[in-house]
């Protein structure tokens, strides 16, 4: 994999292939043609363009110190807050839960002059010619080949403009995720699809908003929550006195929320 990686106990070679390792001979006859057609399609991560396959977008992976091979871990995909980078992932994972999840983070696509670091630019969720959706799909597929990740327990989360990036991805590809966590999003224009999101029925979303946020920001967030609920999502809005610090002890509540989602999914319900 060409993405630059920083991680714990991780080998880049383990993520060279994105597709599932399936032996054609082991498939039922009626599924072989479907599988072969899928492998040849442009939607297959291994068939993405060279720009995507060889993108040098920096990525960080978090693996629990006591990683258990036989356990299917939930995956937390993190979009960092402003003036940070992908290395914020380790602090976030330690604050949320150091053991319960595998973590994945990409660097924001806009470098900041002062105070330094990066952020996500809502005007274009891309890195050069490489779109965020394609790169995230490819990276997640490769990650699942390297580690035992539960395909139905992938959460997307972010803070600030990172929350906008998370919402952008979640609203366009809800089938990829079990739920979304949006900490103090800006909900800039273009974050949600112009035609309105689809496929959100019974999807769980957690939104935190600070009482100190600007009125125009609050208005955009209220409108976004209404749009998500109209599309069928179950949105839990939590008001806080100050913006949530994703690396502080209060981030532990995100673990509780995700574990509740997983429990309700096992019971056939939704997270509230």
Name every feature range the model reports, one short phrase each:
Residues 38, 51, 55-67, 74-148:
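Serine-hydrolase catalytic machinery in alpha/beta-hydrolase-like enzymes
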Residues 179, 184-263:
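The feature captures the conserved acid-bearing segment of alpha/beta-hydrolase catalytic domains
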Residues 1-73, 101, 223-235, 256, ...:
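A domain-start/cap signature at the N-terminus of enzymes
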Residues 73-74, 99-102, 151-153, 175-179, ...:
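Loop/turn elements at helix/coil->beta-strand transitions in domains of secreted/extracellular proteins
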Residues 152-200:
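Primarily recognizes the serine-hydrolase "nucleophile elbow" in alpha/beta-hydrolase
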Residues 59, 103, 150, 154, ...:
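Hydrophobic anchor at the start of a short beta-strand
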Residues 87-89, 115, 166, 191-192, ...:
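Short glycine-/acidic-enriched loop or helix-start segments at secondary-structure transitions
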């Amino acid at each position: 994999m060409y993405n630059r990686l920083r991680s714990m106990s991780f080998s880049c070679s383990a993520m060279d292939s994105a597709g599932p390792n399936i032996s054609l001979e082991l498939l039922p006859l009626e599924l072989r043609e479907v599988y072969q057609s899928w492998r040849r399609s442009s939607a297959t991560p291994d068939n993405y363009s060279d720009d995507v396959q060889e993108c040098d977008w920096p990525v960080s992976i978090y693996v629990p110190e006591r990683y258990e091979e036989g356990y299917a871990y939930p995956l937390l995909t993190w979009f960092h807050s402003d003036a940070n980078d992908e290395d914020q992932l380790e602090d976030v994972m330690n604050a949320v839960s150091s053991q319960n999840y595998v973590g994945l983070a990409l660097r924001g696509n806009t470098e900041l002059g002062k105070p330094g670091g990066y952020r996500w630019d809502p005007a274009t969720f891309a890195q050069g010619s490489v779109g965020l959706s394609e790169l995230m799909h490819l990276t997640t597929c490769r990650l699942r080949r390297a580690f035992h990740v539960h395909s139905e327990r992938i959460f997307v989360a972010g803070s600030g403009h990172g929350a906008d990036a998370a919402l952008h991805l979640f609203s366009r590809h809800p089938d990829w995720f079990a739920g979304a966590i949006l900490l103090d999003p800006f909900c800039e224009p273009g974050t949600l699809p112009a035609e309105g999101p689809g496929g959100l029925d019974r999807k769980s979303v957690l939104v935190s908003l600070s009482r100190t946020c600007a009125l125009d920001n609050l208005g955009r967030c209220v409108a976004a929550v209404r749009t998500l609920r109209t599309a069928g999502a179950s949105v839990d809005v939590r008001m806080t006195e100050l913006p949530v610090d994703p690396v502080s002890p209060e981030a532990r509540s995100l673990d509780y929320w995700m574990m509740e989602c997983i429990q309700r999914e096992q019971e056939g319900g939704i997270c509230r």
